[in-house]
Amino acid sequence: MTVYNINLGIGWASSGVEYAQAYRAKIFREMGQEAKFVFMDLILGDNIEHMTSKIGFSDDEIIWLHNYFTDIKIAPSTISLAEIETILPANPERKEVAGRLIRYHYPQDDMVVACNLRAMDEDAVETVSYFVNDKLLRKDFYSYTRYCSEYSAPKDNQAKVYQRRFYNEDGSTAYDMIVGDNNQDIYRFPDQVLYGKQEFLRYFFKR
């Protein structure tokens, strides 16, 4: 039997609730009781693994709702800058380093690609953002592979996300999330379409 613990989100400044859950995970481990800790929020500000491992969860104890429908494991960001450079457009005119942010400039295409490292003293890349004419068009999220892409379009002088794509390990699309207003997102799977977060949650709990 597996014990499932349902949570909403997690952040770097975790509340007592998350620490209590991590303590509960430790107790379950000592008892030999299998347990999973489910996080329901869309968590893309940072790789969820970096936050859950920081307070004591094991990676195999974590289920993240939006990752659950893929075959990508919960894991730290380990893909290197050198690996990312192999998939970027060739021959940038200039490479600019500013702390954790590495920018590649392609003025011939009015494009800048910005790689955000996990930490100042690490080579692991967390996100890669693509700007054209100073407008954010796409942002890719990485652990040991790309697990999500976020597509944006300019609106009211800001980048408005209109679609998120979640991937499998082989790079194929697991499902698309079409971003709507008032939490009316559409989740498009190969075999069905779900309308709104409530249908998405029901589909998850049926699995």
Locate the predicted segments by residue:
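Repetitive, compositionally biased segments used for assembly/scaffolding
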Residues: 86-198
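Long terminal segments
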Residues: 1-76, 80-83, 163, 167-207
